[in-house]
Design a protein with these regions (language model features):
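Extracytoplasmic soluble-region selector
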Residues: 1-150
């Protein structure tokens, strides 16, 4: 795996999955090689845009403005430890879910997918993650929004 412009994005593979980590706004070409086969993909990194109106975790609401500069929020694990909480991502107008919502424990090698607004068991200790991928309906820009329970 390689990136033609490593200052824009870093590319790497773990097991059979390929990753590109954005570093700054710009364009790069990601190249993946396997044996005699080479595949290339153009990647455009855009400036982060907040897609969140609010997030509800149990009875608590996280204001959308908390996501203005970063696509993640740290939530108190001890407050929800070993409980089930309904988690709902409320998106701003013009944004849609790519898939549903995924959650995983820090030591899992898998994740579980559920619908937005599902009741999720918060367990496994600090490092529990809830994540969703969303897309801007007009521009096609995608953002991964995450709750990290610490």
């Amino acid at each position: 795996m390689s990136s033609s412009n490593s200052s824009v994005a870093e590319a790497y593979a773990i097991y059979s999955e390929l990753y590109a980590v954005p570093k700054k706004v710009g364009k790069t070409v990601i190249t993946a090689k396997s044996g005699k086969t080479t595949r290339k993909c153009n990647l455009t990194v855009k400036k982060y845009v907040n897609p969140i109106a609010s997030v509800k975790v149990g009875n608590s609401t996280i204001a959308g403005k908390k996501f203005d500069t970063e696509a993640y929020r740290v939530v108190s694990y001890s407050r929800f430890a070993n409980k089930k909480a309904k988690i709902t991502f409320n998106l701003k107008k013009g944004w849609s879910f790519v898939d549903g919502v995924s959650y995983l424990q820090k030591n899992w090698m898998k994740s579980e997918d559920v619908k937005n607004g599902a009741v999720i068991p918060i367990r496994g200790g600090s490092g529990f993650v809830v994540i969703t991928n969303v897309v801007n309906d007009k521009t096609g820009q995608q953002e991964a929004v995450m709750l990290l329970f610490k």
